[in-house]
Design a protein with these regions (language model features):
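Electropositive, beta-rich accessory/interaction domains or terminal extensions
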Residues: 5-182
């Protein structure tokens, strides 16, 4: 913990599958105009989703299964093996699984793996999809979410409840600033 009021990067998170698996990383190389590497590379569509698998382009989050629909998704952790592009997924209620989502059979295996943590009244998972060259962020342009630890701490104190950074799905968490100074 630092006492200065100089901003510094406290945490870096990426989410290889949108809303399904967070991974804390120590460092990352950023490229102007691109999402954080390995962030939201994949997204999970549901039956009758409007996402066009045959012409994959950026789409709003409403066409994907996500934590607001399936809250148990938020407990998934991921570890990207950058050497081969495979990902290890873990969830407290499921057996760990290690897959290469570039492989069709592994994508089908992922859908089977995630099905038990989908609510019964929610749309059923259908296909894992991606858009070449960008992550499936919530913006229609490649973006990186930068959040403030001090603002999160202040919000937690006001709510009298610990809020974990993973709840907000941010990429880069900075600290060393006054709460809410990012809004000034």
């Amino acid at each position: 913990w630092r006492l200065s009021m100089e901003p510094f990067v406290e945490q870096i998170w990426r989410h290889p599958v949108k809303s399904l698996g967070a991974e804390k990383v120590n460092s990352v190389t950023l490229t102007k105009g691109e999402t954080l590497p390995w962030d939201r590379v994949w997204a999970l569509t549901y039956e009758n989703s409007r996402f066009d698998i045959s012409n994959p382009v950026w789409s709003p989050c409403s066409v994907f299964l996500r934590g607001s629909i399936a809250p148990l998704f938020l407990a998934v952790t991921a570890k990207v093996i950058e050497l081969d592009g495979s990902i290890e997924f873990n969830h407290p209620k499921l057996k760990s699984i290690h897959l290469n989502l570039y492989d069709q059979l592994d994508r089908q295996e992922f859908i089977k793996w995630v099905a038990p943590i989908c609510p019964e009244n929610a749309p059923k998972p259908s296909k894992l999809c991606r858009v070449i060259g960008r992550g499936m962020t919530d913006t229609d342009y490649p973006s990186i979410s930068i959040n403030s630890i001090s603002s999160l701490t202040d919000l937690s104190n006001r709510m009298n409840k610990h809020l974990h950074p993973r709840r907000f799905r941010g990429n880069i968490w900075i600290d060393g600033l006054k709460p809410w100074s990012e809004l000034e």
